């Protein structure tokens, strides 16, 4: 839609999370299950590519597209993980996106949600009902690492209209 393209065009960084499965990869491309190569780009990937080209033409810079691999498993050597990594790398070259590791599958993230917390919030025994564990601290570090890997542009803009992006028709 027009609004979707406009929102994408105004973004400095586009983050697309995918889980470790070929089902999620379908949002980027159709993959041949027999030889692990992509057959075609998805409508979403084509839209993002078009918007990035338009942004390059109108502003001389493009959108930083980052695919974030989420719910990472400790089974890095599983057949599925190896195949998926190969295809994502191939797609990153073709579609010019960066790949960043996201967050692991951690029970602690499910623990935070019902009490309205994120891994970056302050938490202690009073808030959690128990002393924070190494898992809580590891989750926080994982989120901090993800944010660092995104390499987001400086958001400390001056007040007023300086630095604010205006959509180009």
Regions found by a protein language model. Give the residues of each.
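Conserved catalytic-core segment of NTP-binding enzymes
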Residues: 1-101
């Amino acid at each position: 839609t027009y609004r979707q393209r406009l929102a994408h065009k105004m973004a400095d960084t586009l983050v697309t999370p995918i889980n470790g499965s070929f089902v999620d990869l379908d949002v980027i491309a159709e993959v041949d299950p027999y030889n692990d190569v992509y057959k075609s780009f998805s409508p979403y990937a084509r839209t993002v590519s078009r918007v990035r080209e338009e942004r390059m033409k109108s502003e001389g810079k493009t959108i930083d597209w980052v695919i974030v691999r989420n719910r990472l498993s400790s089974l890095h050597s599983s057949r599925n993980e190896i195949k998926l990594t190969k295809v994502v790398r191939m797609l990153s070259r073709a579609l010019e996106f960066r790949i960043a590791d996201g967050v692991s599958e951690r029970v602690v993230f499910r623990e935070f949600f019902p009490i309205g917390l994120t891994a970056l919030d302050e938490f202690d025994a009073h808030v959690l009902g128990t002393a924070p564990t190494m898992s809580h601290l590891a989750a926080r570090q994982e989120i901090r690492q993800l944010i660092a890997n995104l390499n987001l542009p400086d958001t400390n803009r001056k007040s007023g209209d300086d630095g604010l992006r205006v959509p180009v028709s």
